[in-house]
């Protein structure tokens, strides 16, 4: 049996983070949740993940800074931003940092699931 893909979610809204974590677990992923960018970076350093899903607007360390730190540790890890920041400049910045995708809240959970599967097929 194939090993479950490990996903790190970094999201400061505890309700949203919990719902997203449960949804992905329901689809057979091994999911960790961090409540801010600092906690997310610590979890990333301790565990080998297959995908990171990052909010942008968070206390202590925003998602763009976190993504830059993650990229300095692992250039290949797939990153998806999942955020309410919808300005063109934010989307462009996300991709310049190295995002594989950028989804704007509110979003369709099935689309996130399909984007994740697509990333896993390529990697």
Residues of each region from the PLM?
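Active-site beta3 strand of CheY-like receiver
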Residues: 47-53
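C-terminal output helix
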Residues: 107-116
């Amino acid at each position: 049996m194939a090993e479950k893909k490990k996903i790190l979610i970094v999201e400061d809204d505890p309700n949203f983070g919990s719902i997203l974590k449960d949804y992905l677990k329901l689809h057979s992923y091994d999911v960790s949740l961090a409540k801010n960018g600092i906690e997310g970076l610590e979890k990333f350093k301790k565990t080998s993940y297959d995908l990171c899903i990052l909010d942008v607007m968070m206390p202590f360390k925003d998602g763009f800074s976190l993504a830059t730190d993650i990229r300095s540790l692992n250039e290949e890890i797939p990153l998806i931003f999942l955020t309410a920041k919808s300005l063109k400049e934010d989307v462009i910045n996300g991709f310049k940092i190295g995002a594989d995708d950028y989804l704007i809240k509110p979003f369709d959970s099935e689309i996130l699931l399909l984007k994740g599967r697509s990333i896993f097929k390529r990697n």
